[in-house]
Amino acid sequence: VNQLAVQLKTTTNPDMRRYERPHINEVWCGDSSVGPYLKTDDGKKHRVYIIALIDDASRFIVGIDVFFNDNFVNLMSVIKSAVAKYGRPQLFNFDNGRSYKNKQMELLAARIGSVIHYDQPYTPTQKAKIERWFRTMKDQWMAGLDIRDFHSLDELRGNLLAYVQTYNQSPHSSLKGMSPQDRYFSEPNLFHRLSEEQIGHCFLLEIERKVSADSVITIDQTEYEVDCRFAKQRIKLRYSADLKDLFVVEADGTLTPIRLLNKKENAFVKREKVHLCRGEE
C-alpha cells in the first residue's frame, strides 16, 4: 500500500463502481462469447459464437442467438429480433470490438432513435452484467451439454433458447427474488415499439457507390441496374444483409428499389431519347 498516497488521499486507481439503471430499456448491453464446437453432418467441427443482449435494470435477456461467425451482420440480426419483440432501448452499451464499433452500427442506432456508449478499455464494470451472465451460461448450460447430441445450429439454438427461457423466468438474487422476466415486464409504459415497416427500413445496410455511364453499380461482385438519371453520379444505397432488397436513397430520403442487371433483357428495351428544352419560339 502506498502510505503517502493514502495520507494525501490520492490514487492512480480508476474510479470503477457498480451501477444499475433504475428502469428497463434504458440500457441494453451486448457482447459475444465463444461457445462449444459443433460437429456438423459433413464431419467437420465448427466453433460456435453466441451473441447476446441483456437489459441492465432487469437482467432480462432480450436477444440471443448462435452463429458460426462473430460479425456485425449477425449482431444486427440479434438486435433486429430484440427490437421487433420489445422495442428500442435508449442506449446500447458495447465494447470496442470491430463488430460493434463501425459506421453501420452508428447508422442503425441513429435510425431507431438509440445512442451508443462504447466502453473504455480496461473498465470491466461497464459491461459486468453481460460478462457475468455469460459465465453463468457456461457453468449452467455449456457444462452440461453433450455436443454429440447436436448436428446443426438449429438444434443447438433450440436448446440454448430453452435455457434462456428458464433463466429469464427464474428468481434472481440481485432482483430481490423477482425473475428477470417479471422485472422486465413490470414497466409496460417503457416499451418504445417500432412498426414492422420502420424496422424493415431501419435495419438496412448502407453504402455509397459510383454509377457507371450505363447506369450500373456493383455490390459484392454482383451488378445491379439503377435509373439512367443516376448515371455517372455517386449515390447512396440501402440493402438487406441477404441482398434480397436493394434501394437507392433519393434526395428526399425515399427509397427506390433497384434490380439485378439483365443484359439480355436490356437488348430488347427501347431506349428513351433525351429531349433538350430550347425555350419558346
What is each PLM-predicted segment?
Residues I54-D55, P124, V249:
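Hydrophobic alpha-helical segments, especially N-terminal targeting/anchoring helices
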Residues Y86-Q104, Q120:
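Acidic/histidine-rich, metal-coordinating catalytic segments
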Residues E106-G200, A241:
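Charged alpha-helix within mobile-element recombinases
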Residues N168-E281:
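C-terminal, beta-rich DNA-binding module of retroviral/retroelements integrases
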